[in-house]
């Protein structure tokens, strides 16, 4: 089983702020749930509409907050689709998505838990 988690607004408290990627506050309650699922053997996929240019900062933030994951899917350079269309592609292979945006949940094509 693969469970997907959005970053901004889900694992992190705030929406994406390009100048504040490394300082974003985590949501400990969601991160605890993610860790519990990971320890139970569930594969974790992290998805974000952040541009690929922020991969190193994003990976740093995930390590800083000890967030285990197997896959990190980000927005490819030049991809200007609306977030819900992107999210539907990103969560391919996942069974469940945790996300803060209703539109992402509605179009994801998988069971979604809004947080």
Task: Report the location of each language-model feature.
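Short phosphate-binding/catalytic loops that engage adenosine nucleotides
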Residues: 42, 67, 110
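Asp-based phosphoryl-transfer active-site loop
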Residues: 1-16
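Short, acidic loop-to-helix structural element flanking the phosphoryl-transfer center
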Residues: 18-45, 56
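Substrate-recognition "cap/lid" segment bordering the active-site pocket of phosphatases
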Residues: 52-95
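Conserved Rossmann-like nucleotide-cofactor binding loop
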Residues: 10, 52, 103
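Anion (oxyanion) recognition and catalysis
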Residues: 35-39, 63, 106-109
């Amino acid at each position: 089983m693969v469970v997907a988690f959005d970053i901004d607004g889900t694992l992190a408290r705030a929406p994406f702020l390009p100048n504040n990627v490394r300082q974003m506050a985590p949501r400990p309650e969601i991160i605890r749930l993610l860790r519990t699922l990971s320890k139970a053997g569930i594969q974790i996929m992290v998805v974000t509409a952040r541009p690929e240019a922020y991969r190193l900062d994003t990976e740093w933030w995930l390590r800083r907050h000890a967030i285990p994951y197997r896959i990190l899917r980000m927005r490819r350079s030049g991809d200007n689709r609306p977030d819900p269309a992107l999210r539907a592609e990103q969560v391919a292979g996942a069974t469940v998505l945790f996300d803060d945006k209703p539109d992402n949940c509605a179009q994801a094509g998988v069971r979604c838990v809004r947080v």
